[in-house]
């Protein structure tokens, strides 16, 4: 069930980030950078999650400023996420494992600060400006943060189980 207020959103964000952080904290770079059969590594997944927090914050700021909000990013449509994610992996190829972990932590802190500073009515009082759907900024924040943290943890556990 999706969070419906700031307190719930902060609680689920902290819970899911802590779980992911503990999971990746013990992984060394050789494990994190080993690609699976589809060419995707744990490092790729974690870097992707950090990136999507910045995407969300950019969408929010663009909407607040009355700018065009590019979903998911300029030059891409939602049905082109595979291409977007592949292009993102190419852009992030030179990030090492410690850089990725730091980017995730920094992203979490930015998301947490956004939620803490955003008034409740701005988070859950109506659709996010520029989003062209009914999702509130709080729901978008949950999708970019806690939901992505949870799916990354699941991917990592599956990857480790399959490898071991």
Spans of features found by a protein language model:
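A short, mixed-charge helix-start or loop-turn motif at secondary-structure junctions
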Residues: 2-6, 89-94, 134-138
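Short amphipathic alpha-helical segments with heptad-repeat character
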Residues: 10-14, 46, 50, 98-101, ...
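Structural signal for well-ordered, non-membrane alpha-helices
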Residues: 17-28, 53-57, 61, 105-119, ...
């Amino acid at each position: 069930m999706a969070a419906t207020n700031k307190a719930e959103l902060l609680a689920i964000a902290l819970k899911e980030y802590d779980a992911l952080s503990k999971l990746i904290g013990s992984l060394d770079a050789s494990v994190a950078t080993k690609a699976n059969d589809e060419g995707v590594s744990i490092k790729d997944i974690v870097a992707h999650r950090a990136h999507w927090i910045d995407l969300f914050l950019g969408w929010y700021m663009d909407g607040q400023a009355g700018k065009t909000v590019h979903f998911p990013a300029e030059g891409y449509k939602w049905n082109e996420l595979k291409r977007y994610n592949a292009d993102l992996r190419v852009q992030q190829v030179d990030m090492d494992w410690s850089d990725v972990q730091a980017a995730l932590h920094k992203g979490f802190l930015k998301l947490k600060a956004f939620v803490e500073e955003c008034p409740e009515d701005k988070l859950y009082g109506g659709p996010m400006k520029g989003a062209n759907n009914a999702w509130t900024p709080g729901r978008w924040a949950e999708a970019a943060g806690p939901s992505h943290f949870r799916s990354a943890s699941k991917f990592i556990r599956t990857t480790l189980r399959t490898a071991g």
